[in-house]
Each structure stands twice: as C-alpha cells, then as structure tokens.
C-alpha cells in the first residue's frame, strides 16, 4: 500500500510485527544478560518474556524515534520508567535502566535503523524509515484480512 506510515497502524500491532521481524532477521545484537536483568530500579522482577522482550523494546524505541525528530537515551529512560512501590509511602517516578536503552539504541544503530543526530540524540535513518514503513504496510494489510 503506497503512502502507509507507522502512524497509520495501531502501536501494539506494529511493535509486535517489527519485533518479530527483528527476531527473524537475527541481526540485532542482544546482550547476554537480558534473561536476568530488571528493566528499571522500580521493578521487582525481570520481564516475563525472557526471549522476546529485548526485541519488543527495540521495536518500541524505533517507533518512538520515528514519530519524533530525535530522541536521546535520557528521554527514553524517562519514558520507560515507572512508579516505584515504596510500601506505605507515596509512589515516586523512577527512570528505566539506561544501560538497556543504550544497548537497544546502539544495536538499532549498528543495523542501520538509527543514526546519530547532529543536534544530539538519535534519529531515524532513511533505510530505517523505509523498513518501518514497509513493516507498517504489511501489518495494515494483515489487519484488513
């Protein structure tokens, strides 16, 4: 479908489709510690999906950067952070793990989806935009059927 972009597809459908694409492609460099690490200091446990959560995080980061001009790792830490349960005391926002987000961004940059922005942070590359639009069109076609 010509003219289909990531904005035209529901977020969850696109993220799942792009994560499956990244996993099938096998080029995304996954750190060895992803099956035991927590994603934030505010979390009690690591993610339930030990094999696929890193691909979903990378797909979500790619979509987030696609929808904006450029994004840095600090903004991603704030985005993926959440409330820390402090018992009887009020909840407070805790940023997500910077290491995980940095490794996702570096892996996406290595396969050519992202590039360094001269203004700071990362932005989507032309090849990355083409890939994401192609996956979005395929996802939209599957939803129509």
Swiss-Prot record:
Residues 123-134 have a biased composition (Basic and acidic residues). It is found in: Cytoplasm. It holds the Pfam family Ribosomal_S19e. GO terms for molecular function: RNA binding; structural constituent of ribosome. Keywords: Cytoplasm, Ribonucleoprotein, Ribosomal protein. Signal peptide: none annotated. Its main location: cytoplasm. SUPFAM superfamilies: Winged helix' DNA-binding domain (SSF46785). One of its GO terms (biological process) is ribosomal small subunit assembly. Residues 120-145 are annotated as: Disordered. SMART domains: Ribosomal_S19e (SM01413). The keyword Nucleotide-binding does not apply. Component of the ribosome, a large ribonucleoprotein complex responsible for the synthesis of proteins in the cell. The small ribosomal subunit (SSU) binds messenger RNAs (mRNAs) and translates the encoded message by selecting cognate aminoacyl-transfer RNA (tRNA) molecules. The large subunit (LSU) contains the ribosomal catalytic site termed the peptidyl transferase center (PTC), which catalyzes the formation of peptide bonds, thereby polymerizing the amino acids delivered by tRNAs into a polypeptide chain. Component of the small ribosomal subunit. Mature ribosomes consist of a small (40S) and a large (60S) subunit. The 40S subunit contains about 32 different proteins and 1 molecule of RNA (18S). The 60S subunit contains 45 different proteins and 3 molecules of RNA (25S, 5.8S and 5S). This is Small ribosomal subunit protein eS19. The lineage of its organism: Eukaryota, Fungi, Dikarya, Ascomycota, Saccharomycotina. The gene is RPS19A.
